[in-house]
């Protein structure tokens, strides 16, 4: 190997070796937020019951905030596709860590299965979270719903929350 090739290889090896120790360091770890519950609140003052035809706000409450996350996409839906949804679709999570919300109107009384899917692009490494929780992790929400956390390789976390709600007349 001549000197010219050696001079090109040394900087790359130095960079590679310098970064390899950080892969499992918690301070460089991206983490998704951990959710505790999905709460529904009527928009009409004084109301406590969700009613058909009346708007209400659905909030996914975080138990702990995420960390080192950038582009984030939220999608709210219901299993029957009957609810009217209005929500913020994209945020930069580290700048906007508020709880995700959806304003919903149900056309009729009944049970509706709500789903929120969030994709959090990681700006740090995801291996710390995967090493601690696995690449597919489920937990129960305090309100009877469920949360599923999936690590998308080195690049993102996917979080799915599900809960059935009751809407009255």
Predicted region positions:
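Sec-dependent bacterial lipoprotein signal peptides
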Residues: 1-19
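Generic preference for well-ordered secondary structure
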Residues: 3, 22-24, 44, 149
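Bacterial Sec-dependent N-terminal signal peptides
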Residues: 13-41
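First exposed extracellular module after export/assembly in secreted or surface-exposed proteins
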Residues: 30-169
């Amino acid at each position: 190997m001549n000197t010219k090739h050696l001079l090109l290889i040394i900087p790359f090896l130095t960079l590679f070796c310098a970064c390899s120790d950080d892969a499992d360091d918690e301070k460089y770890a991206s983490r998704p937020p951990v959710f505790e519950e999905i709460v529904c609140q009527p928009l009409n003052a004084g109301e406590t019951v969700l009613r058909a035809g009346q708007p209400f706000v659905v909030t996914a409450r975080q138990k702990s905030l995420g960390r080192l996350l950038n582009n984030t996409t939220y999608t709210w839906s219901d299993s029957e596709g009957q609810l009217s949804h209005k929500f913020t679709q994209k945020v930069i999570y580290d700048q906007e860590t508020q709880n995700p919300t959806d304003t919903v109107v149900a056309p009729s009384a009944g049970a509706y299965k709500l789903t929120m899917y969030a994709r959090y692009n990681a700006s740090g490494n995801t291996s710390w979270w995967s090493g601690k929780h696995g690449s597919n992790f489920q937990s129960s929400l305090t309100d009877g719903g469920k949360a599923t956390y999936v690590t998308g390789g080195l690049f993102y976390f996917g979080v799915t929350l599900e809960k059935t709600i009751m809407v009255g007349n």
